[in-house]
């Protein structure tokens, strides 16, 4: 369904806007679909890609079945493993590494590295298939669990596993109160399906937060925040913090820096130039599906985020393990 943002747009532009992320469809591919009679507007076959839409127009696409996606290949990539047994692994993902192959990132992912690890350890064909239990955004660093079998993956994703995930974030502003709960429903942005927004009727999403420190000498400044996910929605922390007026430093999608500059000029420049969202999954706790032991893992901040925290004079407030 065309929305207000599609009014007067070309058909191919509007369709690409909604479908490029989810289906990997380019404008050229959409133009071919129009030429093949596979696109209908309000029940009538579209005559040309440049046809203009109106808000409320119903657009139907008859998509051909996608070609089978090749199985991810093993790649020798750096891999930081904190724990491994015959059922699972716990790894620390660096910033900039995609967790799972996608249309945009077919190689060079964490899963490719895990496949190499499986084969390398077992001399040839892997005897187990890594299955990521949860994911992190490309530019979010920190802890992830990979199961070695489907039954372990299912068990870890059940409520019995009791997953607890904590993050450290550097945000713009001074969260008030210093400790609290953010309870905002989240859903896809109707104008950009790649984004998430707080909206009525969305999925329940709850975040608990605690301000650990504030940067020195500025009424606005930066804050170091510890967050626990009660639920695990896509982009939950990024959207929740931004919705409260405390966007994460470096977040290109949700974290636009405030126009007002910080009094500390060097810190302001460093924060505005930070190349990714300053978000790190630092603690993970869960019940092992076989031994039923409660396992907890901590990961120190990566160097870029640790330097930002230190520049803001907040390093003493870090949980002890988060200091390299």
Regions inferred by a protein language model and the residue ranges of each:
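RNA pseudouridine synthases
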Residues: 1-191, 216-218, 301-315, 319-324
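Residue-level recognition of short loop/turn positions
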Residues: 36, 42, 231, 290-291
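Structural motif
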Residues: 57-58, 233, 293
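Short coil-to-beta-strand transition motifs
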Residues: 73-76, 164, 198-207, 278-279
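Pseudouridine synthase
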Residues: 99, 106-118, 148-153, 188, ...
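Accessory recognition modules or surfaces
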Residues: 192-231, 244-265, 269-270, 295-324
């Amino acid at each position: 369904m065309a929305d207000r943002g599609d009014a007067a747009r070309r058909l191919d532009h509007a369709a690409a806007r909604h479908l490029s992320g989810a289906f990997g469809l380019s404008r050229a591919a959409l133009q071919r679909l129009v030429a093949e009679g596979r696109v209908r507007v309000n029940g009538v076959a579209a005559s040309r890609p440049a046809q203009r839409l109106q808000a409320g127009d119903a657009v139907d696409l008859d998509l051909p079945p996608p070609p089978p996606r090749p199985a991810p290949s093993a790649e020798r990539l750096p891999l930081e493993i904190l724990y491994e047994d015959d059922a699972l692994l716990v790894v620390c993902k660096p910033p900039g590494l995609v967790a799972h192959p996608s249309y945009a990132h077919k190689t060079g992912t964490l899963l490719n590295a895990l496949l190499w690890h499986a084969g390398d350890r077992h001399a040839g064909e892997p005897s187990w298939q890594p299955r990521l239990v949860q994911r992190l955004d490309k530019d979010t660093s920190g802890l992830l669990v990979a199961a070695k079998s489907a039954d372990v993956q299912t068990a870890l994703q059940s409520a019995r596993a009791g997953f607890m995930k904590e993050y450290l974030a550097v945000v713009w502003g001074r969260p008030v109160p210093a400790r609290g709960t953010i309870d905002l429903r989240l859903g896809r942005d109707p104008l950009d399906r790649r984004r998430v927004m707080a909206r009525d009727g969305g999925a329940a999403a709850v975040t608990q937060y605690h301000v650990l420190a504030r940067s020195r000498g500025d009424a606005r400044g930066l804050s170091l925040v510890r967050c626990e996910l009660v639920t695990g929605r896509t982009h939950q922390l990024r959207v929740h913090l931004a919705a409260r007026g405390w966007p994460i430093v470096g977040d290109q999608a949700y974290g636009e820096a405030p126009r007002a500059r910080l009094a500390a000029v060097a810190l302001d420049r460093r924060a505005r130039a930070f190349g990714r969202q300053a978000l790190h999954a630092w603690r993970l706790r869960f019940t092992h599906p076989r031994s039923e032991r409660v396992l907890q893992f901590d990961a120190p901040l990566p160097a870029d985020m640790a330097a930002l925290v230190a520049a803001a004079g907040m390093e003493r407030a870090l949980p002890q393990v988060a200091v390299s």
